[in-house]
């Protein structure tokens, strides 16, 4: 019977520990749930998903928040984003920002690449610096070309909102080159390693 008071005392001491919130999984573990589409390090292995390695954390967080509240069109990201807290999204954003983008070689048309480089320099470079490499305006360089086609179609079909300046610049590129503008930009970005 003397053991009973000791067990009761130990049980009382353990109560505060049980009431503490459990620490969530680390950001790296959360980020690995993205691997099926975006690659284990954020460099996508498949042509319909964007690479998110090296992405500016604010761009990542803004995109996830937009998915979370259905402001950004997607097949499944809206449902996925709703499963994460703001803190978890921030942790994943920091994880992916530290990763190095590893573009995959793609088949491109050299004539379109050259035209796309000119269009980018004239209309896009100011916001998408260094040829569209990872930065605070998102990553274009080295993205899969089919993904870029889907993203451009979303903008053109008004499934995704254009920033005003981007819409004006894009209209100017289309006025200049017509139907060749979009494929040229896509080939240029897809050509970059």
Each language-model region and where it sits:
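Bacterial N-terminal signal peptides
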Residues: 8-18
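C-terminal capping alpha-helices of c-type cytochrome domains
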Residues: 82-104, 146, 151, 171-193
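Accessory recognition modules or surfaces
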Residues: 80-83, 87-112, 125-143
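Positively charged n-region of N-terminal signal peptides that target proteins for export
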Residues: 1-5
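Conserved hydrophobic/aromatic "anchor" residues
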Residues: 67, 95-96, 120, 155, ...
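Sequence/structural segment immediately N-terminal to covalent heme-attachment motifs in c-type
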Residues: 23-41, 108-130, 144, 180
């Amino acid at each position: 019977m003397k053991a009973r008071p000791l067990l009761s005392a130990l049980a009382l001491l353990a109560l505060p520990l049980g009431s503490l919130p459990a620490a969530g999984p680390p950001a790296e573990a959360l980020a690995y749930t993205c691997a099926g589409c975006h690659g284990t390090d954020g460099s996508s292995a498949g042509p319909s998903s964007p690479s998110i390695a090296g992405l500016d954390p604010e761009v990542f967080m803004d995109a996830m928040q937009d998915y979370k509240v259905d402001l950004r069109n997607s097949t499944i990201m809206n449902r996925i984003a709703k499963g994460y807290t703001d803190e978890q999204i921030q942790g994943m954003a920091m994880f992916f920002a530290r990763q190095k983008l590893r573009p995959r070689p793609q088949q491109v048309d050299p004539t379109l690449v050259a035209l796309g480089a000119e269009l980018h320099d004239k209309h896009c470079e100011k916001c998408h610096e260094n040829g569209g490499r990872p930065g605070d305006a998102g990553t274009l360089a080295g993205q899969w070309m089919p993904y870029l086609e889907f993203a451009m179609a979303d903008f053109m079909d008004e499934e995704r909102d254009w920033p005003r300046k981007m819409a004006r610049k894009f209209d100017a590129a289309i006025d200049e080159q017509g139907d060749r503008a979009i494929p040229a930009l896509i080939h240029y970005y897809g050509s970059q390693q």
